[in-house]
Amino acid sequence: ISSSQIAIVYADGAIVDGEGYGADIYGNTLAAKLAKVRRNDDVKAVVLRVNSPGGSALASDVIWREVELLREKKPVIVSMGSYAASGGYYISCGADAIVADKTTLTGSIGVFGMFLRLEDALKNKLGITFDAVRTNTSADMGVMRPLTGTERAAIMRSVDEVYETFTSYVAEGRNLPLEKVLDIAGGRVWSGTDALALGLVDTNGGLKTAIAIAADKAELGDKFRIVEMTEAPTGFGAFFSGFMAKVKADIVAGEL
């Protein structure tokens, strides 16, 4: 029996910061899992199964960097599920090959920022108001007052910087001119068929196709076994995770 393995690592859910398990992709947790297979000499190739609408830019970048380190040691193939958009594409774009179903929703190469405001809700609903004493005009920036023009401009600069990073990663990972990436970016969503024509993915197919490509790139022939890297929740955790995944899938389908 061959000791050579192809590891399947699942990235399923919204991408969030930190560590944890459940219906989301926790950036540090997934990065640690990828580091684990990178250090395992029995694992000769990795299939990263991505089914995500995106999420945190920071967590996406943490995962992207670990994918880059993994690629230095062994082939990494991405298999896209129903959707791999925004951060889902961010963590995919550096792989050695990307496989998407024809109906996969992908791309959405874009960045946005949100800033919660509670001032009106607290004042109008609860009668709560706040006064502030501050050392400078932005010291009390938060949910209790509107952003100033300077603060809004600073947040916009941060969004622009993340967008520039995202598009440069796509250009480098997909070997595309940056000008072409900018033409197809801007948050636009593409089907797997369109993504293939645009160069955002390498072929249309499912998980079996991705495994076959991984075996070929690692020169394994048919002498390998598949290992699934999962830490599945049990009991109520399994029920709740499945329920939340269904809710998020319905929301994404409605938005896209």
Tell where the protein language model's regions lie, with residue ranges:
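Assembly/oligomerization interface modules of large self-assembling protein complexes
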Residues: I1, R39, E68-R71, V78, ...
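Intrinsic disorder and flexible/low-complexity segments
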Residues: S3-Q5, Y10-G22, Y26-A35, S158, ...
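Envelope-exposed proteins and targeting segments
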Residues: S4-A7, D42-V46, D96, D222
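Hydrophobic alpha-helical segments that mediate membrane insertion or helix-helix packing
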Residues: V9, L48, I91-S92, A195
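A mature extracytoplasmic/lumenal domain signature
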Residues: Y10-I15, V50-G54, S82, D202, ...
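Phosphate-binding active sites in nucleotide-utilizing proteins
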Residues: I15-V16, Y21-S52, A57-L58, V62
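Conserved catalytic cores of soluble enzyme domains
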Residues: V50-V189, D216
